[in-house]
Amino acid sequence: MAETQAPTGYLFSEKHEWVKVEGDMALIGISDFAQSALGDIVFVDLPKTGKNIKQFETFGTIESVKAAEDLYAPIGGEVIESNSALSKNPGDVNSKPFDSWMIKVKGFSTSELDKLLTPEKYKALVAGLE
């Protein structure tokens, strides 16, 4: 298997979601490893704007031709936007997992970021799973 992508500027959960902080808001999506393991993604169910989510709790589901899986929030906060483009083109998560954010959140605690993995630590975690 090819080396998993884990770009600089992103933090990762052990459940294979990523977070990218941009000012006072953060983008959340799934990792390259997760999309590869799932296979062709056919549906993404995301929360509505205004929903409060908690770190490491489910915020939605993702379905592929292989399986349906829960999505876990790498950080908590208020959902300020869900990526509606994914309802029309869920396969974008496969082709560009780091450009295909799922939700934007604000009001997160920066201390929650300390519980996440750096790209290097995430690559080491994934290497142990392959």
From Swiss-Prot:
Quote the cofactor binding remark: Binds 1 lipoyl cofactor covalently.
Keyword ATP-binding listed: no
Note whether Nucleotidyltransferase occurs among the keywords. no
Residue stretches making up the Lipoyl-binding domain: 25-106
Necessary cofactors: (R)-lipoate
Gene Ontology annotations of biological process type: glycine decarboxylation via glycine cleavage system
Gene Ontology cellular component annotations, sorted alphabetically? cytosol; glycine cleavage complex
Keyword annotations from UniProtKB, A to Z: Lipoyl
The record's section on InterPro entries has:
2-oxoA_DH_lipoyl-BS (IPR003016), Biotin_lipoyl (IPR000089), GCV_H (IPR002930), GCV_H/Fam206 (IPR033753), GCV_H_sub (IPR017453), Single_hybrid_motif (IPR011053)
Instruction: Supply the CDD domains for this chain.
Output: GCS_H (cd06848)
Q: Which residues carry this modification: N6-lipoyllysine?
A: 66
Q: Which SUPFAM superfamilies match?
A: Single hybrid motif (SSF51230)
Pfam families hit by this protein: GCV_H
- UniProt xrefs under PROSITE patterns: BIOTINYL_LIPOYL, LIPOYL
User: What role is this protein assigned?
Assistant: The glycine cleavage system catalyzes the degradation of glycine. The H protein shuttles the methylamine group of glycine from the P protein to the T protein.
| Entry's family note | Belongs to the GcvH family.
Assembly state and interactors?
Answer: The glycine cleavage system is composed of four proteins: P, T, L and H.
Protein name, per record = Glycine cleavage system H protein
Q: What is the lineage of its organism?
A: Bacteria, Pseudomonadati, Spirochaetota, Spirochaetia, Leptospirales
What gene name does this entry carry? Answer: gcvH
